[in-house]
C-alpha cells in the first residue's frame, strides 16, 4: 500500500510571527513629528485618576492637600451636597497609592463611590512636535487653571466595530470629533483632558474624558454636539457615569517644576 504524501502543512511546522523590529523589542515611547517631519519620541506620560466620594470634610482635605503640595484637584459634586471628587495627576502612578490615598484615609466617615473611579494615561496621536507639552505640561496646566473651575468627567467605551473600520474611515471620524472640540476650545468655551484607559479600569473603558470650562452650560452643549458625530452615534458602546462638579481646591501650576 502506498503512503499518502505529506502535505506542506503536515511536514513543515507553522512559522511564528516575527517579533517587532524595534531596537530588538517593543518600543513603548510616545511618537510625534518634529521639524521637517522628523520622528520624535518621549517615554514619559501623565497618569490621571478621578475618584468620587461622599461624607468627607472638603475644607479639611483641602488643607491637607495644600500642606502636602498635592498634585490633585478637589471638585464639589453639583448633584450631591455631601459628595466631591478628586482628580490626581502624576508621572509615577505609585504617587496615587503612596501620597494621595493616605491623605484620603484621614477622613473617618469617607464613603467611596466606586462608580466614579477612572484611571487613564496621556498619549500622543503621532503628529505632535512638542511631546512634553502634550503629554505632561498641558494636561496638568488645564486641570490646575483657576479660570476653568467647572468640570465634567466620564468614561467612554467604543464598540469593537470601530476597530474593524478602515484606517481612513477612522481618521475621518476622529477628525470630525476633534474639529468640534477644537472649535469649542478656540472660542474659549471648553478645554478637553482625554486620557487612554485601556486595561486600567474594571469596566475596560477606552478613554476617560474631562471637559473643563469657565461655565457649565458650554460643557453640556459640547457633549450634545458630539452626540451627532458618526463616531458617537454609531460606535460608542457606553458613556458615563458622568461626574459634574466645580473645583474648590486646585494646586498652583508651575511649568518649571517636574511632576512626580
Regions inferred by a protein language model and the residue ranges of each:
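A common structural junction motif
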Residues: 69-71, 104-112, 226-235
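Metal- and O2-centered redox machinery and metal/ROS homeostasis
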Residues: 70-73, 185
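Short S/T/G/P-rich N-terminal loop/turn motif that feeds into the first structured element of a domain
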Residues: 2-68, 90-99, 110-183, 214, ...
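Short, well-ordered beta-strand segments in beta-rich or mixed alpha/beta enzyme
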Residues: 48-52, 76-104, 151-157, 196, ...
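Intrinsically disordered, low-complexity segments enriched in Gly and acidic/Ser/Thr residues
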Residues: 172-204
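A generic structural motif
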Residues: 72-79, 114-121, 233-247
